[in-house]
Amino acid sequence: MKKLSLFLIIISIISCKTVEVNQQRQQTTKTVVELGVIGKITKGIEINTFQTTTVPVYKQKIRVSADILAFDDNTFNTYAQAALQQNKKIKITYIDSVANKPGYANLQILDKVQVLDELNAPHNTGVNTYLQNATNNVLITGLSAYFDAIELSNISQAEEVYLINNKPKKYSLELVKSGKPFAIVDISKSVPFTYTTASFCWKKERGKISIANLTYKSETCARETYKNVAKLNKKINYYKY
């Protein structure tokens, strides 16, 4: 009986830290999380906390997928806790028995190659150097957030969505329709309540260290690439012996 109770407690704690969004388990957050930033996750008993450590410069816009999803009980409760903690005064009327439920946006970075190019570019040398010397940093690759009705409507009409760095250390969404931008959405005005992350895999070519790839969840780095930069400098050349 004690083992069963302990098991149920563990399952309850895990379920509080994640919630299913679009058939994907995502980390829950009560604090503000921004798409495209880099930071560290501090594990807690009830919830993990993400803290931003560095904000990369994206000179090129990054393609993003944007799905408008309807709240269910789990996602709405997660949102409500986040809105309270973030002191965001955005009111939503949610009734479980009503078929037409309010929606939110699920954003995911699509263009991983563009992100890698940007992180390895000269304008992000400081970010790159920091990441080489600081462990356990992750990139925010996706988030679920509530935007006001007008912005949600604009996002739903967009044929293409891009993450843009239109102000210093500030990201927005550029919405495109018929090949032309028609709206800019300020992400900071939303209420994020879940997020996804990716870790960095590093390589060394001709003496230069750079980010080779981004890995998700339990994925491992490809051959000759490592999550720990120190391993690149500890490789032994056995041909010397």
In which residue ranges do the predicted regions lie?
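Membrane pore-forming effector domains from diverse proteins
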Residues: 53, 91-158, 174-239
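Short aromatic-glycine motifs in intrinsically disordered, low-complexity regions
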Residues: 160-162
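Edge/loop elements at the starts and ends of beta-strands within beta-rich repeat scaffolds
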Residues: 164-168
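Residue-level marker of positions within ordered structural domains that often coincide
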Residues: 6, 21, 178-180
